[in-house]
Amino acid sequence: MSNDGDLNIDNLITRLLEVRGCRPGKPVTMSEAEIRALCHKSREIFLSQPILLELEAPLKICGDIHGQYNDLLRLFEYGGFPPEANYLFLGDYVDRGKQSLETICLLLAYKVKYPENFFLLRGNHECASINRIYGFYDECKRRFSIKLWKTFTDCFNCLPIAALIDEKIFCCHGGLSPDLQNMEQIRRVMRPTDVPDTGLLCDLLWSDPDKDVTGWGENDRGVSFTFGPDVVAKFLNRHDLDLICRAHQVVEDGYEFFAKRQLVTLFSAPNYCGEFDNAGGMMSVDETLMCSFQILKPSEKKAKYQYQGMNSGRPAVGGGRPGTTAGKK
């Protein structure tokens, strides 16, 4: 078993950031021992912090990244590299993209370096049965070993599953659950844990809003449920909350409101899988809980290998639009 002696966190972060400006997809040189040590150290930190995080604004919230490492670097260029800004990521760091290892290693490294300012929630892809199939297992096996993939699984099984920002914004990867009556139920989930096929933890990572549903509906994914605007309104009212912030679905503009701006979906992987023309969105929450959005535009098809640097994003919706403030009414 590795120990933390194998881990020089500053040196690792430096190497991970050195590929900025290089051709997208350039692999970062890392050793299996240091990645293993990174997993062990970050796992310790996850277990030392609550499974339901209680965070304070200001912070920036990001949705799915899915191994699109170059786009993760673009997000940080735009929002500020830690510790310049505080961050909450909503899960789905691995699978589908070409550089899941660089992506998860940079995120875990920032967690170790800035444990009180940088937060990661669990997505449905931070689960062995899913990332065994959709790319992460194959990437670990090809570049290092199956054993390393298992070490990541042990780390992912300890990630927090939801966050409350100033007791007003509820954040999770997927959505609500018919089993969720009070926040204490989330706090009672014991870690390490796999993601079960049904129940509260499954729903928080897998469910989706559906404007055409009242109450709860079947989910086309074959897992969990869909929930209607009435469920959102009821949940916010019961818990004295203002907004649900979640990820889990590709949305064209990088962010999309639902249920009269009571729920927002964030998706932070532009040109997802190279198959969509979606933008990537990041939500900034200021001290007054005003929410605004920073957008990474999808890259032009013809500029496939052109580095997309500081000017690749454009600010979206100015802060003053009605319904974008949570909390301070």
Swiss-Prot record:
It holds the Pfam family STPPase_N. It comes from the Eukaryota. It comes from Caenorhabditis elegans. One of its GO terms (cellular component) is cytoplasm. Mn(2+) 2 binds at D64, D92, N124, H173, H248. The keyword Cell cycle applies. It is an enzyme of class 3 (hydrolase). Interacts with lab-1; the interaction is direct. Interacts with knl-1; the interaction is direct. One of its GO terms (molecular function) is protein serine/threonine phosphatase activity. The active site is at H125 (proton donor). InterPro entries: Calcineurin-like_PHP_ApaH, Metallo-depent_PP-like, PP1_catalytic_subunit, Ser/Thr-sp_prot-phosphatase, STPPase_N. The gene is gsp-1. Binds 2 manganese ions per subunit. Its cofactor is Mn(2+). Serine/threonine-protein phosphatase which antagonizes the function of air-2 in the regulation of chromosome cohesion. Dephosphorylates histone H3 at 'Ser-10'. Dephosphorylates translation initiation factor eIF2alpha. Involved in the activation of chloride channel clh-3 during cell swelling and meiotic maturation. Residues 309-329 are annotated as: Disordered. Keywords: Cell cycle, Cell division, Chromatin regulator, Hydrolase, Manganese, Meiosis, Metal-binding, Mitosis, Protein phosphatase. GO terms for biological process: cell division; chromatin organization; meiotic cell cycle; negative regulation of protein phosphorylation; positive regulation of gene expression. This is Serine/threonine-protein phosphatase PP1-alpha. SMART domains: PP2Ac (SM00156). The keyword Lipid metabolism does not apply. Belongs to the PPP phosphatase family. PP-1 subfamily.
